[in-house]
From Swiss-Prot:
Name of this protein: Aryl hydrocarbon receptor nuclear translocator 2
Disease implicated: Webb-Dattani syndrome: A disorder characterized by postnatal microcephaly with fronto-temporal lobe hypoplasia, multiple pituitary hormone deficiency, global developmental delay, seizures, severe visual impairment and abnormalities of the kidneys and urinary tract.
Gene: ARNT2
InterPro entries reported for this sequence: bHLH_dom (IPR011598), Circadian_TF (IPR050933), HLH_DNA-bd_sf (IPR036638), Nuc_translocat (IPR001067), PAC (IPR001610), PAS (IPR000014), PAS-like_dom_sf (IPR035965), PAS_fold (IPR013767)
The PAC domain, residue ranges: 398-441
UniProt feature, compositional bias: Low complexity: 610-625, 658-680
Species this chain originates from: Homo sapiens (Human)
Pfam families documented for this protein: HLH, PAS, PAS_11
Length: 717
């Protein structure tokens, strides 16, 4: 009973809140075992309480560790994100095939910033500029070298902030026309949208999209598009800018080439009242406006209209076509033009120079077959040439045909054509033709030759210095070769006026040489012994022997005239060495054995063999108008052959002298020789001396004297 009583009171007490502690008090003594058994539970609760205390003590440190790891993770993610953006912004990093590491990205970014800001130089205050140049001079030199003009426009509005004065020679516009206007007004209407896209710094739907050539798909450029807002982002585009009508008188002379280049790269002829445009290549950077540390006046604030960015660029003429032809070297009339055809001969492009060559406008020829302008008799020939050039695949083929011009006349045209092939598909894209007016080209070449002859006609022979050549065997050989070139019959006609300028006294002196055509210098009964032996020529000076027929005169000119007559009669081949031609005034000489210039102790005389001379009896030799020495080929061979087996230099100097002499016989044949006065300058001072030259009085020695010298190879006429 005790047991249920002990059990029920707690159950009953549980229903009464106020009697919870009443049954516990009397059971305090009797429930020793139960209390003892309940102690572990109480102790367990305390341990759980102690465990709570331990967890509460470790909680803040664990939470702090978890927070620190989270912070580090977020920081690493942000750093990776920023470095990825930096890698996309640096062109050198984005161009790499594989993704670089973080250190490489940072290093390339620093190098890129230095190159953009110019901090690679130690001095950033402009001290790198040469000290001898001012800023204005440096600016003009840069623009002159670039052959363009500098301009600054607001990025948002396109308002022109600055333009250099070099815009005048490039676009033929005064600087004042650009100030107060916008760049949109200066470009072609079809290029306005393209220019607006280049000046825009914000992203649009087409910004940052690139075409993948491998797959043919359009991809997003990623973070590269953020460079449009980046300071110093580069701009490069081509547009058509309007040309002005500034007078050429205000342009410097050194800009003629630029003007010709601008007309060449123009977009063809324009109609009346339409503006002319030129293709301009603009390169520059987007910069902040106004620059850091610079304040602009209030009146200039309206120009920028609160724009934060501006475009600083240089505009240069873009050469659309630069054909290599003669008329590009000067301001002459064009003689050729370019044309492009398809494989069927249809004209797809024509050079504007066709207006000056054939008279047609480019639009009159576009879309038409070239056979329509060809002569009916030449159409088959031209058609075959086009078919042949397609088969040649890149080789040049030329053809000449008659072309119908604008004024219904036939013009002889030479067309040099070749094909352009696609390097990938190896298919013929089009045919390029260079069409040249043959007649006009020949006229220009003839005019060029006339100008050259005019320049040569003013050449004064008296101003030519004559060097003192040493008289020797080696120099004599050189003089013979030079004489062949000077006195040849095939002389250039451009020098006719130079030879026609010989004074009248020289003509008179040479005229008397044709009067004695049948005389004989050396008669068959001459007392001279037979040919001289072939001993070595010991002296470089040769003296003319005292022949009875040659009398010493009181002047050098008289001796020259007599020797000329003897040459016309006997065809003596003057060879060998002779003293140098002093080119000075020589006083009258009396009958001496040796003249003063020949400083040799004893005079040497070399008698000639009478059989060595073959006088001509043909009347052609005495006729002034006939061919000099017409029977020269029928003469007996071998001059001075008594001591040699073969005759060297068989009369060649004689022919040379006769050719030069025959030019003056027909003009002054009736005049008599006038004696020169003592002290007068010697004739032919301007000509180089020749071996065996009769003007030197040394033509009566034989070729035997050079028998032992091997520097004169034998040759036949």
């Amino acid at each position: 009973m005790a047991t249920p009583a002990a059990v029920n009171p707690p159950e009953m007490a549980s229903d009464i809140p106020g009697s919870v502690t009443l049954p516990v008090a009397p059971m305090a003594a009797t429930g020793q075992v139960r209390m003892a058994g309940a102690m572990p539970a109480r102790g367990g609760k305390r341990r759980s309480g102690m465990d709570f205390d331990d967890e509460d003590g470790e909680g803040p440190s664990k939470f702090s560790r978890e927070n620190h790891s989270e912070i580090e993770r977020r920081r690493r993610n942000k750093m990776t994100q920023y470095i990825t953006e930096l890698s996309d912004m640096v062109p050198t990093c984005s161009a790499l095939a594989r993704k670089p590491d973080k250190l490489t990205i940072l290093r390339m970014a620093v190098s890129h910033m230095k190159s953009m800001r110019g901090t690679g130089n130690k001095s950033t205050d402009g001290a790198y500029k040469p000290s001898f140049l001012t800023e204005q001079e440096l600016k003009h030199l840069i623009l002159e070298a670039a052959d363009g003009f500098l301009f600054v426009v607001a990025a948002e509005t396109g308002r022109v902030i600055y333009v250099s004065d070099s815009v005048t020679p490039v676009l033929n516009q005064p600087q004042s026309e650009w100030f107060g206007s916008t760049l949109y007004e200066q470009v072609h209407p079809d290029d306005v949208e393209k220019l607006r896209e280049q000046l825009c710094t914000s992203e649009n739907s087409m910004t940052g999209r690139i075409l993948d050539l491998k797959t043919g798909t359009v991809k997003k450029e990623g973070q590269q598009s953020s460079m449009r807002m980046c300071m110093g982002s580069r701009r490069s585009f081509i547009c058509r800018m309007r040309c002005g009508n500034a007078p050429l008188d205000h342009l410097p002379l050194n800009r003629i080439t630029t003007m010709r280049k601008r007309f060449r790269n123009g977009l063809g002829p324009v109609k009346e009242g339409e503006a002319q445009y030129a293709v301009v290549h603009c390169t520059g950077y987007i910069k902040a406006w106004p620059p850091a540390g610079m304040t602009i006046p209030e009146e200039d604030a309206d120009v920028g209209q609160g724009s934060k960015y501006c475009l600083v660029a240089i505009g240069r003429l873009q050469v659309t076509s630069s054909p290599v032809c003669m008329d590009m070297n000067g301001m002459s009339v064009p003689t050729e033009f370019l044309s492009r055809h398809n494989s069927d001969g249809i004209i797809t492009f024509v050079d504007p120079r066709c207006i000056s060559v054939i008279g047609y406008q480019p639009q009159d020829l576009l879309g038409k077959d070239i056979l329509e302008f060809c002569h009916p008799e030449d159409q088959s020939h031209l058609r075959e040439s086009f078919q042949q050039v397609v088969k040649l695949k890149g080789q040049v083929l030329s053809v000449m045909y008659r072309f119908r011009t604008k004024n219904r006349e036939w013009m002889l045209i030479r067309t040099s054509s070749f094909t352009f092939q696609n390097p990938y598909s190896d298919e013929i894209e089009y045919i390029i033709c260079t069409n040249t007016n043959v007649k006009q080209l020949q006229q220009q070449q003839a005019e060029l030759e006339v100008h050259q002859r005019d320049g040569l006609s003013s050449y004064d022979l008296s101003q030519v210095p004559v060097p003192n050549l040493p008289a020797g065997v080696h120099e004599a050989g050189k003089s013979v070769e030079k004489a062949d070139a000077i006195f040849s019959q095939e002389r250039d006609p451009r020098f006719a006026e130079m030879f026609a300028g010989i004074s009248a006294s020289e003509k008179k002196m040479m005229s008397s040489a044709s009067a004695a055509g049948t005389q004989q210098i050396y008669s068959q009964g001459s007392p001279f012994p037979s040919g001289h032996s072939g001993k070595a020529f010991s002296s470089s000076v040769v003296h003319v022997p005292g022949v009875n027929d040659i009398q010493s005169s009181s002047s050098t000119g008289q001796n020259m005239s007599q020797i000329s007559r003897q040459l016309n009669q006997s065809q003596v081949a003057w060879t060998g060495s002779r003293p140098p031609f002093p080119g000075q005034q020589i006083p009258s000489q009396s009958s001496k054995t040796q003249s003063s210039p020949f400083g040799i102790g004893t005079s040497h005389t070399y008698p000639a063999d009478p059989s060595s001379y073959s006088p001509l009896s043909s009347p052609a030799t005495s006729s002034p108008s006939g061919n000099a020495y017409s029977s020269l080929a029928n003469r007996t061979p071998g001059f001075a052959e008594s001591g040699q087996s073969s005759g060297q230099f068989q009369g060649r100097p004689s022919e040379v002298w006769s050719q030069w002499q025959s030019q003056h016989h027909g003009q002054q044949s009736g005049e008599q020789h006038s004696h020169q006065q003592p002290g007068q300058t010697e004739v032919f001072q301007d000509m180089l001396p020749m071996p065996g030259d009769p003007t030197q009085g040394t033509g009566n020695y034989n070729i035997e004297d050079f028998a032992d010298l091997g520097m004169f190879p034998p040759f036949s006429e």
